[in-house]
């Protein structure tokens, strides 16, 4: 099985590759279109701003490929957020693959932002098989509200989507590569059981 991490020039590429390699999945980091087209599974990581991520994808001529791929793709953190229509972060249009808008967390007394740390995630979807009541590691200031495409939810000052899915596109707001055993199980589920 060919597993490719789409090279978005963001900071967490190496840690995701290390996690995949440690699990025995030989992953490649690439932005080469021919190589990406040969993938069985794709990962779209992201750290930073939606504007920066979209600029990089445009610069690397990856937007059309991502929008048209039929291969299972997992967006991670910002990679999930840019699967939507629009991010309120610097008012940025995104990939328009799943119908949602990324919004800033609502301020609430007793909560600090960015949301950083371990939170329980609730889901009965196959992506979360064996992960009932599992905790995952989050680092984000913007979130996706609950909606039609939510497959897992979480709460921190408000309820939000911990994971979304439409067709072959999946997204997780947390960092599975930094979420210990729970993250490893989720990555294995995506590679072995999805698509």
Curated annotation (Swiss-Prot):
It is found in: Cytoplasm. Its EC number is 4.3.2.10, 3.5.1.2. Keywords: Amino-acid biosynthesis, Cytoplasm, Glutamine amidotransferase, Histidine biosynthesis, Hydrolase, Lyase. The active site is at 77 (nucleophile), 175, 177. Signal peptide: none annotated. Its main location: cytoplasm. GO terms for biological process: L-histidine biosynthetic process. Pathway: Amino-acid biosynthesis; L-histidine biosynthesis; L-histidine from 5-phospho-alpha-D-ribose 1-diphosphate: step 5/9. It catalyses: 5-[(5-phospho-1-deoxy-D-ribulos-1-ylimino)methylamino]-1-(5-phospho-beta-D-ribosyl)imidazole-4-carboxamide + L-glutamine = D-erythro-1-(imidazol-4-yl)glycerol 3-phosphate + 5-amino-1-(5-phospho-beta-D-ribosyl)imidazole-4-carboxamide + L-glutamate + H(+); L-glutamine + H2O = L-glutamate + NH4(+). GO terms for molecular function: glutaminase activity; imidazoleglycerol-phosphate synthase activity; lyase activity. The keyword Cytoplasm applies. Pfam families: GATase (PF00117). Residues 2-195 form the Glutamine amidotransferase type-1 domain. The keyword S-adenosyl-L-methionine does not apply. GO terms for cellular component: cytoplasm. NCBIfam families: IMP_synth_hisH (TIGR01855). Heterodimer of HisH and HisF. IGPS catalyzes the conversion of PRFAR and glutamine to IGP, AICAR and glutamate. The HisH subunit provides the glutamine amidotransferase activity that produces the ammonia necessary to HisF for the synthesis of IGP and AICAR. HAMAP family: HisH. This is Imidazole glycerol phosphate synthase subunit HisH 2. It comes from Campylobacter jejuni subsp. jejuni serotype O:2 (strain ATCC 700819 / NCTC 11168). The gene is hisH2.
């Amino acid at each position: 099985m060919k597993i490719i991490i789409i090279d978005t020039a963001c900071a967490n590429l190496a840690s995701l590759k290390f996690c995949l390699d440690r699990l025995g999945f030989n992953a490649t980091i690439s932005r080469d279109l021919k190589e990406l087209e040969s993938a069985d599974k794709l990962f779209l990581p992201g750290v930073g701003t939606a504007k920066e991520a979209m600029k990089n994808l445009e610069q690397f001529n990856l937007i059309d490929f991502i929008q048209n791929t039929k291969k299972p793709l997992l967006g991670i953190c910002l990679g999930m957020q840019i699967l939507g229509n629009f991010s309120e972060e610097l008012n940025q249009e995104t990939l328009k693959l799943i119908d949602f808008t990324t919004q800033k967390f609502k301020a609430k007394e007793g909560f600090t932002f960015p949301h950083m740390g371990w939170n329980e995630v609730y889901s009965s979807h196959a992506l979360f098989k064996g992960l009932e009541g599992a905790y995952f590691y989050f680092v984000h200031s913007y979130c996706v509200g609950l909606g039609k495409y939510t497959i897992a939810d979480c709460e921190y000052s408000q309820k939000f989507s911990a994971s979304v899915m439409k067709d072959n596109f999946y997204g997780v707001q947390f960092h599975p590569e930094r979420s210990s055993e729970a993250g490893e199980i989720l990555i294995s589920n995506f590679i072995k059981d999805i698509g």
